[in-house]
A protein has these predicted regions:
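Hydrophobic, aromatic-rich cap/lid helix
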Residues: 169-206
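Short beta-strand/loop motif that positions the catalytic acidic residue
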Residues: 211, 217-219
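Catalytic active-site module of serine/aspartate enzymes centered on a nucleophile-bearing elbow/loop
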Residues: 241-289
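Conserved acidic catalytic loop of the alpha/beta-hydrolase fold
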Residues: 74-92
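Glycine-rich "HGGG/HGxG" loop immediately N-terminal to the catalytic nucleophile
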Residues: 55-73, 255-256
Length: 289
């Protein structure tokens, strides 16, 4: 694992493989690059002649915590673009699932110079899905800061991994003004709330429609309440020339992975099944010429 400093933040990353085509792979949730399925997907891509950067977003894994920006995903997208530029890598195929799909989309929209292509699956959307994200990612920290201050935030179970893996993160929390912290998380919370003209939280449909790179969208399952099928299909229709493809698994994949995760398995364990489809698509679309 290597560490890069991007805008004053410590960002943990690894480059896997030595192929000519570069991928930037981003997981969802607040999961690390070391979470089950992420590295395996990168290694499967590398085994097919690709080069892949996996990284810990701010607020994930061994990277620094950061509470700035209009939304958490926008902040992470800006850091990914900064990481690729600082390493003199790219442009890359920006790829990810769930929250990583949102970060990937925002990266391509906000920083077109680092994106040669875009691939997304399990794209969060819908009223239920987006409101759930707002509550999950913001509510516990807002409540803790409001009632007991920043030490209580740092003691929350959801931040235990980032503090254990990067102990300086505890000091980062304690240095934050609780009122400013609450204001930031309420802004992030608002960004998840469904708004007219925003299919994907945090980015306008008009900006998405302006994308001019090869784009792959994997259709979501009809049974998935968090990454709705309508979101994936509508997003593919918004992006000129986007390819909407069927997933390499059944309709209940997300539901079954949630059940498996409750038993200790990883949500992303089956992501490597996407690799043949990703390779076939890039071979056909030739994003890097």
């Amino acid at each position: 694992m290597a560490i890069a400093t991007i805008d004053g933040l410590e960002i943990a990353y690894e480059v896997i493989g030595d192929g000519r085509r570069l991928w930037a792979l981003t997981p969802g949730g607040r999961f690390s690059k070391d979470y089950g399925g992420v590295r395996a997907t990168a290694e499967a891509l590398a085994a097919r002649g690709q080069r892949v950067i996996i990284w810990d977003r701010p607020n994930c894994g061994a990277s620094s915590v950061c509470f700035t920006g209009e939304s958490e995903s926008a902040m992470q997208a800006d850091v990914l673009a900064g990481l690729l530029r600082s390493l003199d890598l790219g442009p890359a195929v920006i790829a990810g699932g769930s929250g990583g799909a949102r970060v990937s989309l925002l990266t391509a929209v906000r920083h077109p110079d680092v994106a040669s292509a875009l691939a997304m699956w399990w794209i969060s959307g819908g009223v239920f899905g987006n409101i759930g994200l707002a509550v999950t990612y913001c509510s516990p920290s807002i409540k803790a800061a409001w009632t007991d201050g920043m030490e209580a935030v740092a003691d929350l179970p959801e931040w235990s991994e980032v503090i254990t893996r990067n102990p300086s993160n505890r000091d980062r929390f304690l240095r934050l003004d609780p009122h400013e912290f609450i204001a930031t998380l309420e802004r992030w919370m608002s960004a998840y709330c469904p708004q007219p003209g925003q299919l994907v939280a945090g980015t306008d449909d008009a900006a998405v429609h302006g994308l001019a790179i090869p784009t792959l969208v994997v259709r979501s399952g009809a049974s998935d309440p968090h990454h709705t099928r309508a979101t994936s299909e509508t997003l593919a229709g918004l992006i000129p020339g986007a390819d909407l493809v069927e997933p390499p698994w059944g309709d209940r994949e997300w539901v079954e992975r949630m059940d498996a995760a409750a038993k200790g398995e990883a949500l992303f364990d089956r992501w490597p099944f996407l690799v043949p489809r990703l390779i076939e698509w890039t071979a056909a679309r030739r994003p890097d010429g």
